[in-house]
Amino acid sequence: MTSIQERGTSAHLHSLKEGEASDRSSEMLPKQRSIIGSHVQRPPSQTTLGRSRAGSNTMNKVSGLDIARRPSENLLSNMNCSDNGNGGNMLNSFVNSALPPPKVNPAQTRRERPASNSSIGTKTTEVFSSTSASSSLGDTSDEGEGSDADKSKINTFPSILMEKATQGRGADGNGMRSASNNTIVEATTDGSKMALQKSMSFDDTAAEKTMNKSRHSYQEQFSSKKSQSSLLNSKQRSRAKSQTCSSTGYNNSSILKTFGISSKISNSSDRIEASSLEFNVPSQKPLNCKPLTPSQKYRLRKEQSEMNLRNTIKRKEKFYDSQEQILELQEGDVDDSLIWNVPMASLSTNSFLASAKPDDMNNLAGKNDLSEYTGGLVNDNSEISYTKQNHRYSNISFASTTSNASLLDFNEMPTSPIPGLNKVTDFQFIQDTTKSLASVYLHSSNRLSRSKLSERTKSSDFLPIELKEAQNQGMEDLILVSENKLDVVSHSRPSWLPPKDRQEKKLHERQINKSMSVASLDQLGKNKDREEKLIRDETNRQKYVLLLDRDITRNSSLQSLSKMVWDTPFSDETRSTIYSEILQSKTRFITKNYIQPFHELQELLTKMGDFPKNKEIEISQLIETSLRRKVSGLHDICPDLMLLLKIKSISSQGIVTGDELLFHHFLVSESFQNLGLNEIWNIVNLVQMTCFNDLCKEKFDAKVLERKGVVAGYLSQNEEFKDEFNTECINSTTWWNILERIDHKLFMWIMDIIVVNNSQSYKNSPINEDEFVNKDWEYYRSKKVVINYKILISFALNVLLNYHFGFTDLRSLCNVNDQRFCIPVFINDEFVDADTVNAVFIKKWAHYYKKF
């Protein structure tokens, strides 16, 4: 598709040549002379005025036609002003006749640009493959009326002449040339005719040569050999054409000098050729020898700038993700791009074998072909960084650094045989030499590794503690790590999570420091309390011994004892003695008068022979449900327990609630193991008759559910206790269900507290044995036994309020199948001290006991 101007030009030239061929030159000559006279002949004084008028008339004419102004208007005005001779008149008349004004389309209503053969939507992509270096060569065609006349001639005039020459070659060679020569001789001078024809031939040759060179230079990036051959062929063809034109006797330089554009055309063509060869892209002018439109030039420059930017980035990049060949996923079916991972280095010492200076590494990288890839690995500030923090940034191998040549001890190599003198083959000689060199390298590298390891050991004292933790987790030895890697590695986040940014790391470090400070203060407080408790326990144990020596049944001694027992349980050496003295005084009055002797009952059991099977089954079932299925079953059960329970079953009191627990824990306790079964029998019966007698149980059942009592005040405030605040769930029998879930150590401490709170001062009110002669147990109990049900109620209240989880009520507590379930909850943790947990339980119990 050709433009309006080109179609008019070609049509006019075609009609002109047909007229010349049919011998109608006489009719066309007067018309051409009239056109030449009307356009060219004007006084020299009116040159400037005529130029401005021509420009204004042209703008008015083009504006009225709704067509953009073309650079040819400036060309006509400049040529009219510069040429006043006959040759100039002939040229102006020819150009004006060859370039008529474009026709106006009456139906055109919008201001649209005329269609051209080189429109914006080009069909080829060769136009947009040039770089920005060649895009500036054709920018002179975009200049306005303020541009120089020479630039207008360079940009516009050769294209017109080239079109003329192209159409002239399309006709018959000899006939058309002779007819054209005859017509032009009659109308113009010989000099003007020679200038016109030589200009046409020169522009054709120069344009074709430039076009061929640009095309072949663009093809050089695909095949160098093919490009060179094509370039030689194009140069030979262009040289042949130039020789053909010069053989006709025409002088190319004379006509170019006539218009003043000889040097500029040659310089522009040279610049086009140089830029095309440098960037391996075609020139700005397309292959059809048509000038580009301004929009195409803009798109060309834009595309070239983008290509230059991409090439620059490509040269400066060190690594591309596309170059990484992933054969298979290393972590299952999950893509590596979906997982952040801090690089994990090996435990080898190869990372610090490189010790070259930055200057040596830069020189070595400049000699290497892969300098663009490895150049980025060298840090220019590594020497400064090394002096400050003793860190390494280099990853160049040990064998490739010239500075490490002195580290290789070649004296270790054995003497090699001389070829020709020794009977050694070349293969054996090379093999031995290779082994020797390898051994030298290995020994030298090991020696260097040891030296570097010693440096790491010396510098490890100045680094944070978290680096040692990272080393223990399997990461690289981070003793000589850089600051950048230290910022990424965080001991508060796993390595498979994304690294923290600076703000997040500061926030987390602040929170961690705060939490650690609070935890450290708590731990310091706990350690201090533990140390104080150890000192206090040891002091209280010594006081127990002193109280026994001073008479523990004194009123002052009992007051001190009641205070100390909440802090420290009785020792194994003093427990049995304290139990006996504070419950029945030193006279052991209850044991002598109201407890059946153990040896008599044992003899009775022996005389019975076979023990009743039903009773034996009941005792076995009692042991199974109360001990073996509970926390007590975690420890061995003494075989004497069955004997004691059988003896208790044939006694006058019989087996009461809690006998199996008391016998079991007293048998296991070191306080009573060495005393024998007789002493254990007496202690268990003494505790049952004084602390858990029938009167105490009756008062417990009556007071625990009292509406104005302490228990009702706590439990009635919470609706969750409305279903268990009754006699079926809370009574003296279900109270023992709590003791079934108590650990042995805490059980003995609880017994110590209960015994102490049921004691009385026998020193101030001693037992008068004559008063209780022939008196039953109820009479003695009413006179000398303290009934303290409050200590039992406070114990149950503590469990209901603070440890009521894992069971519905006290009645269902015995049905919990978990053997390890205990009160307080069993915590199998080395950082949790069982004594501390028990102390907290006792402290809460003391708090509720003070409420009664």
Curated annotation (Swiss-Prot):
The modification Phosphoserine is found at residues 72, 201, 459, 517, 520. It comes from the Eukaryota. Residues 1-158, 206-248 are annotated as: Disordered. Residues 124-139, 224-235 have a biased composition (Low complexity). GO terms for cellular component: cytoplasm; Golgi apparatus. Its main location: cytoplasm. It is found in: Cytoplasm; Golgi apparatus. Residues 15-26 have a biased composition (Basic and acidic residues). One of its GO terms (biological process) is protein transport. Keywords: Cell wall biogenesis/degradation, Cytoplasm, Golgi apparatus, Phosphoprotein, Protein transport, Transport. Residues 43-61, 74-96 have a biased composition (Polar residues). With SBE2, is involved in cell wall integrity and polarity processes like bud growth, through the transport of CHS3 and UTR2 to sites of growth. Belongs to the SBE2 family. This is Protein SBE22.
